[in-house]
């Protein structure tokens, strides 16, 4: 069965869901908030997206026609190729009221009939990612005018009706083709080995599906991060523009207040503020009520978006399961046909060799399909990034064009202030010129005095040279006198050493006293010696007597 026949009905069903998803919040926002004019970059991006969708659909038609040429092998495939031009039919652009949602929601190209389940799942994941980004950006977009919304709804109604009718017809044709193919497969019957190969391929497909689901999740996270960064940059640009406009208004107010008379203007402003206080309070309460209504409306819209997102995810999962089922059926049928063709050719090695060769061919085909799906996924990412960059450039250009007038007014104000400063500087310049003349006179007087001081310094220098010569002469005389003084001092010391105690009465008197004392001490020493000698003689006599007495005593 041709896989592209199943994808021909997807734009219709998804278009209806996307139309209902985008039409409901636009009506609510248009009725609740004040109408705001759309950005010029959004209006310019809409026809370019329509041209890209038509080019992608034409490319899908050409690829389908090229892929359907070698499919006339069996009657089952011929029955599945009823409408080769249907997958590539250019999808009619759906006019949605929210322009930024169309930036990232470019309709993907139709898959080729030979695409694998991994590629189909990746494309379905990218489509789901674009729808999620569309749902996020709708919340941040201002509502369009009521007249434009009514015109778009009136233009979108017949297109949605025709797409619904075409989707129902394609569903009927698909059910008929499924019944015919099931009958043919029941009549032919497949061998037990082909069933085992199908089970093995099914297990491998499930493992690859898990890997692709992780990659799709990473892709969704990257896309969400890029969307949030884009929103942050746009809000930052809006903040800068508001700040500049605030400065412009402050300059205006400053100029208006400066033109008025100081105290009177302040009194009039106070009276006006007292009169406008109740009106401002009422306006504040009214805006608070509007804010509460908008918050409630935002919560309702968010709940509705979550419900629609869950429904779209379920539909996407059902379509993915159908695509995988049809892909496995198509691979099994292709293997059976190739085995029959090789069996009719009577290859060397028999059925086992043919089976091995078919497995190698299918493995190579799976590898190429994976490479092709990876390249297509990268192509989709690059297209989305290109669209984001283009919209960002357009918004920046629009903002710069809108800010040129504000810049011009600010430059006018700055020019006026600079002119006033120039007048002040001219007055200061006149004052400085008068000061310069006075300074020149003072400088000439100072120069004359400086010349006189130079002449006086020259005279002083000559006098200083003479005084320095005299000082040098006195310095030489001083050194000579110091040398003579040192010689006299040494002579005096030598003579003092030679003369001894001559001329020193106290020392001489002390010397005489010491001599007298020494003589007295010598005489006393002699008397003591004599007394000691007498004592020793008496001691000897006593000892002799004691020895004699001991000799007479009995022993």
Swiss-Prot record:
GO cellular component, one term: ciliary basal body
Residue ranges, annotated region (Disordered): 1-202
Designated name of the protein: Cilia- and flagella-associated protein 184
Record function comment: In complex with CFAP263, acts as a regulator of ciliary beating that connects radial spoke 3 (RS3) to the inner dynein arm (IDA) and the nexin-dynein regulatory complex (N-DRC). The complex is positioned parallel to N-DRC and forms a connection between the arch at the base of RS3, the IDA tail and N-DRC.
Subunit structure and binding partners: Forms a complex with CFAP263; the interaction is required for functional activity in cilia.
Ranges in a coiled coil: 305-441, 505-531
Designated gene of the protein: CFAP184
Biased composition (Basic and acidic residues): 1-12, 174-202
């Amino acid at each position: 069965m041709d896989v592209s026949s199943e994808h021909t009905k997807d734009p219709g069903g998804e278009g209806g869901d996307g139309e209902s998803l985008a039409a409901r919040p636009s009506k609510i926002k248009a009725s609740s908030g004040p109408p705001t004019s759309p950005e010029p970059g959004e209006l310019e991006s809409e026809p370019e997206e329509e041209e890209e969708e038509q080019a992608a659909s034409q490319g899908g038609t050409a690829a389908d026609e090229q892929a359907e040429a070698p499919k006339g092998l069996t009657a089952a495939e011929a029955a599945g190729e009823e409408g080769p031009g249907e997958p590539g039919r250019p999808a009619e652009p759906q006019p949605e009221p929210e322009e930024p949602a169309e930036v990232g929601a470019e309709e993907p190209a139709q898959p080729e009939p030979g695409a694998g389940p991994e590629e189909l799942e990746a494309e379905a994941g990218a489509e789901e990612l674009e729808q999620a980004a569309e749902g996020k950006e709708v919340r941040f977009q201002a509502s369009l005018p009521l007249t434009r919304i009514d015109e778009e709804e009136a233009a979108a109604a017949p297109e949605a009706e025709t797409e619904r009718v075409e989707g129902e017809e394609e569903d009927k044709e698909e059910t008929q083709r499924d019944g015919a193919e099931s009958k043919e497969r029941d009549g032919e019957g497949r061998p037990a080995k082909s069933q085992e190969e199908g089970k093995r391929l099914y297990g491998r497909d499930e493992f690859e599906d898990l890997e692709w689901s992780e990659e799709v999740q990473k892709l969704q996270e990257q896309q969400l991060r890029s969307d949030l960064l884009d929103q942050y940059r746009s809000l930052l640009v809006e903040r800068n523009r508001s700040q500049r406009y605030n400065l412009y208004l402050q300059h205006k107010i400053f100029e208006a207040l400066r033109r008025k008379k100081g105290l009177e203007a302040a009194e009039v402003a106070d009276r006006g503020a007292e009169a406008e206080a109740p009106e401002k309070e009422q306006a504040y309460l009214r805006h608070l009520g509007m804010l509460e209504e908008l918050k409630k409306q935002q919560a309702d819209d968010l709940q509705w978006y979550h419900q629609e997102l869950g429904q779209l995810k379920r539909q996407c999962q059902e379509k993915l399961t159908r695509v995988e089922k049809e892909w496995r059926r198509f691979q099994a049928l292709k293997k059976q046909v190739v085995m029959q063709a090789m069996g009719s050719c009577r290859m060397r090695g028999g059925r086992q060799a043919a089976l091995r060769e078919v497995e190698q061919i299918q493995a190579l085909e799976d590898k190429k399909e994976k490479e092709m799906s990876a390249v297509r996924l990268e192509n989709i990412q690059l297209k989305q990034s290109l669209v984001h960059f283009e919209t960002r450039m357009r918004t920046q250009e629009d903002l710069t064009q809108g800010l040129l007038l504000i810049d011009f007014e600010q430059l006018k104000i700055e020019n006026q202030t600079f002119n006033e400063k120039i007048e002040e500087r001219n007055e200061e310049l006149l004052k400085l010129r008068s000061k310069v003349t006075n300074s020149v006179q003072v400088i000439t007087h100072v120069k004359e005095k400086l010349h006189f001081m130079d002449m006086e310094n020259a005279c002083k220098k000559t006098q200083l040279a003479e005084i320095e010569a005299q000082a040098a002469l006195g310095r030489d005389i001083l050194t000579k006198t110091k040398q003579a003084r040192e010689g006299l001092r040494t002579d005096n010391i030598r003579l003092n050493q030679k003369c001894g105690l001559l001329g020193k009465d106290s020392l001489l008197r002390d010397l005489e006293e010491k001599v007298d004392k020494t003589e007295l001490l010598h005489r006393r020493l002699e008397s003591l010696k004599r007394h000691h000698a007498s004592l020793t003689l008496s001691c000897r006599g006593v000892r002799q007597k004691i020895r004699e007495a001991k000799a007479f005593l009995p022993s």
